[in-house]
């Protein structure tokens, strides 16, 4: 009986913490209903079971919310689903990187790629950016530690991106003859 009481109290604390983050996210036009928060917490448990992970404390969802709340690519209609998907991706790649990277480093890396390389595409984030980065981590790369995961993807990116200077030069040539 004591065990059930403790679990119930822990769940209530986690729910309270999830509802607290609304204060920070409301200025970005994002908020969670109590039902959304419960759904995120339930999906957290499923993701932890699927990835065979154990987590103590409040979980990663509040940190994900704080990290991603100012994104231009997250809208209110898909907010809860996006947080759930980011949570799943986070746990999957914590395992893939064999816990070599801290939560903060992984979150910073995820956010930077989500904004600048993936432009909000969660499948590209998980299937390309994090897959490539996790291979580097497993192979022994540790350069991310100095930058806390920021600015690291360029060294591993296999996809040719736009050359900004060339683009401007061509734009000037075409438009300002």
Model-based region annotation:
Residues 2-4, 162-177:
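Short acidic DE-rich linear segments
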Residues 31-169:
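Acidic, low-complexity, intrinsically disordered interaction modules
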Residues 2-45:
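Short terminal alpha-helical segments
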